[in-house]
């Protein structure tokens, strides 16, 4: 076979493969390979066609933009094609682009020459959103048509759908817009919107999306615009097409005009001069990439002057005056070599993918999380599969999907082990207990657990590591490797054993000398008087994070009260739902856990909690009789019916004693509701449960007949604060504790409800948003003055 024949065969193969991927990406919205893999195949085809120009044909993917309109939508012919952009993957690619631009403008730039000399070129810079390109056509200021990019020449008519996107103006604002204006931009979904959409899908048993781009594309191409309207889509303009009238003479000027007409543009739009400034912008956006509210995969640079754009013109499928500088790929293909099972501190047996090493976002990845066996089943994963791996920021690499067309014939199914790979104890699937409408039911959970508890060294090590961590007991110097030594040598079999360690035992550990031994023993001693919140967090209760631990401590005031709180009582606390309430209750009801806590609180060797003592004032008499009845989940007794029963009988005892005739006399209480209540109360277990809950509400002072307490107002009560940037006098965690002690809620994001933002050096998008919203902003000195004002030490 000659070189030309081999090239022709490979070219045909690449064209077929690229066309298949284009169809899956643009028409089915089910991409089967990462963008980086597609780009590699595309560049290989480009190179082969450049070497063998006689093999170039008009139908090659390199000669047109990808995709075919779906037949269910009407077709729209783009009078000016919607072309894709050339890509830069390395810094040299960007420098080459700038050189070509300056060469093309040699006659127009001061001091220009054919070698690309002369003045630097102005470029517009903006993030490259990862969404779906669309065209919006305005006539006399009215939105008359929306269309997808399609194949660049022909798209789909999605007018009814784009009209549902809340930030797309149906009528342009202001004045001065052209009679006919085609706006081009990206429809996308923010990270928060994507997470909320998937969470809702999980709740309703619907289909979840793999990423925001797929979610945006799938939402925009719904035949029923009501579905599109229910999705959190957004639009951002980046350019224009057909125009009848005049526009500003620069790219940035046009986008700023769009903003004035109510058309959203990127807040990150910048004007720079020269290739180095472009590179600086690229680096800056790259550093802040994970802090942005939306997914991006690079930045776009465009020659700013429209006259220069026209001078430079176009190539077959892309403009010569623009380029997309891509970030290192966050998705790659690799092979699943095997699956190992790890055991965590709660006994959860978690599958971990062992992968053929591959570079993802500049890091070699050989392992990836699989979360649980339900996720393995959802992916349809088998050993030997080719899989898509994603890595974003500091997030643990994930297996996103299987490339089914590359599955080998000998691919093996993945099975959970029957026995713990560490201790050999049985592995059991968790059972979820649910109470609803007076009934208790069991269902299978997603987690498999080793039943060995602290006799399992994997669980013991992870439990100790969590117990001593900075946000828990904060035992300085007791790192993971030291914990492993303590457990492996049999010196620690429970968190309580830390407090009985002797000098000789610690001194004999690898890496310890006299000073380090004394320091560790001193750190352990210093941890004997933790706050109640730290101790609760240190216990490692499932689903109880640092914030929930603080809430429990602040609300109920003592470990004894928290330990015996019934799930129904716990749900009176804000942000504690039924599932978390049952996790807390079940943890303290467990005999093994009670023994561990008793050992930790041993009078001679254990910890002495700094307890607040009382139930917080805001929870005194917080329960109402109507709310209590509603929480019993009696079939057909909703909030309105509960209020009627409370009003009629005035007490739980009165409701329990009510006969059928009494219930039928409750005004507007439906017969089926009365019958349901009577059936519920005829079950002795239900009555006993209700009386037990009421008794505990009385004991805790939360009962509707309890005395209300005066709430002493904290100075920042009801205010939401946000911390951003670096603080020097204290860590952000410490600053957060100080503000919470003054009554503030410290949030992770800025919104119109934010009262104040504390911004240290390096503050980025949060500070920018605060300034945009006109919020109060303090620097670190301002924060310290505030703490001094209220007598808070720092």
UniProtKB/Swiss-Prot annotation:
GO terms for molecular function: DNA ligase (NAD+) activity; metal ion binding. CDD domains: BRCT_DNA_ligase_like, LIGANc. Residues 711-794 form the BRCT domain. NAD(+) binds at residues 35-39, 84-85, 126, 149, 186, 302, 326. One of its GO terms (cellular component) is cytosol. InterPro entries: BRCT_dom, BRCT_dom_sf, DisA/LigA_HHH, DNA_ligase, DNA_ligase_AS, DNA_ligase_CS, DNAligase_adenylation, DNAligase_N. PROSITE patterns: BRCT, DNA_LIGASE_N1, DNA_LIGASE_N2. Its EC number is 6.5.1.2. Its cofactor is Mg(2+); Mn(2+). It comes from the Bacteria. It catalyses: NAD(+) + (deoxyribonucleotide)n-3'-hydroxyl + 5'-phospho-(deoxyribonucleotide)m = (deoxyribonucleotide)n+m + AMP + beta-nicotinamide D-nucleotide. It holds the Pfam family HHH_2. The active site is at 128 (n6-amp-lysine intermediate). Zn(2+) binds at residues 420, 423, 450, 456. GO terms for biological process: DNA repair; DNA replication. Keywords: DNA damage, DNA repair, DNA replication, Ligase, Magnesium, Manganese, Metal-binding, NAD, Zinc. Belongs to the NAD-dependent DNA ligase family. LigA subfamily. DNA ligase that catalyzes the formation of phosphodiester linkages between 5'-phosphoryl and 3'-hydroxyl groups in double-stranded DNA using NAD as a coenzyme and as the energy source for the reaction. It is essential for DNA replication and repair of damaged DNA. This is DNA ligase. The gene is ligA.
